[in-house]
Amino acid sequence: MLDKTRLRIAMQKSGRLSDESQELLSRCGIKINLQQQRLIAFAENMPIDILRVRDDDIPGLVMDGVVDLGIIGENVLEEELLNRRAQGDDPRYFTLRRLDFGGCRLSLAAPLDAEYTGPQCLQDTRIATSYPHILKQYLDKQGVRFKSCLLNGSVEVAPRAGLADAICDLVSTGATLEANGLREVEVIYRSKACLIQRDGEMSVDKQQLIDRLMTRIQGVIQARESKYIMMHAPSERLDEIITLLPGAERPTILPLAGDKSRVAMHMVSSETLFWETMEKLKALGASSILVLPIEKMME
């Protein structure tokens, strides 16, 4: 029996989203042993319980108030939301924030030899998918009539097996589609992982813990997207150098011992520093340019 005074977070039991969710929690300083194949894990240093479940169960656990938070792909969340609305329910939850991992796209794919000039080509066809509600929402807007063939796996084999004329499935590189004689013809939904919270009253202690967690998540994401830059630069070219680094905060300027014409610059940049930018910095007289990753960050 779970202690209801502890914060309950649902996450994918296994898979890419599970690995990235574990990394996020770890970088937030939450110590949890997730190596053992247990459905429930307990944080050592915070009143947090982790429920490890199938990803398509997570939206329902949050919407039904079984857990407080869930880390889930937007595609799975949207499918469950549309499913419940189709049944006359009014699902309630909050999206706390979009995360910086779990990116994917849901696409229509047709046989390589099929002519495709737009969604209207799918009129009166049979389409295999694991996302019937997202597919219906998209094709209804296009005015396309179709029949849905619900499959929970191996969707890409449906056309060859004679089950469907086309498919709607998650795509990464497209290699699996090509191996099954298919090609991606239309992206209908783009998704990333997100953190969602149940509706309803939350205890003061839980809400304070969620606020702390959100601050840490924000810091982790900012750190991933930022770099710490150090260099020596000529004093008379500082404005030009700063212009080359959009998104950078105002730099810290330090004098160099024995060289009054140059300074040391330290700054945090939210922009990716490409080789071309570094070459331009060097052309302006910068030297000893270091670009370092940031582990943690808090504004």
UniProtKB/Swiss-Prot annotation:
The keyword Cell wall biogenesis/degradation does not apply. The gene is hisG. Its EC number is 2.4.2.17. Transmembrane segments: none annotated. Keywords: Amino-acid biosynthesis, ATP-binding, Cytoplasm, Glycosyltransferase, Histidine biosynthesis, Magnesium, Metal-binding, Nucleotide-binding, Transferase. Pfam families: HisG (PF01634), HisG_C (PF08029). Its main location: cytoplasm. HAMAP family: HisG_Long. Gene3D superfamilies: 3.30.70.120, Periplasmic binding protein-like II. Equilibrium between an active dimeric form, an inactive hexameric form and higher aggregates. Interconversion between the various forms is largely reversible and is influenced by the natural substrates and inhibitors of the enzyme. InterPro entries: ATP-PRT_HisG_long, ATP_PRibTrfase_cat, ATP_PRibTrfase_CS, ATP_PRibTrfase_HisG, HisG_C, N-reg_PII-like_a/b, N-reg_PII/ATP_PRibTrfase_C. Catalyzes the condensation of ATP and 5-phosphoribose 1-diphosphate to form N'-(5'-phosphoribosyl)-ATP (PR-ATP). Has a crucial role in the pathway because the rate of histidine biosynthesis seems to be controlled primarily by regulation of HisG enzymatic activity. It is found in: Cytoplasm. Feedback inhibited by histidine. Its cofactor is Mg(2+). This is ATP phosphoribosyltransferase.
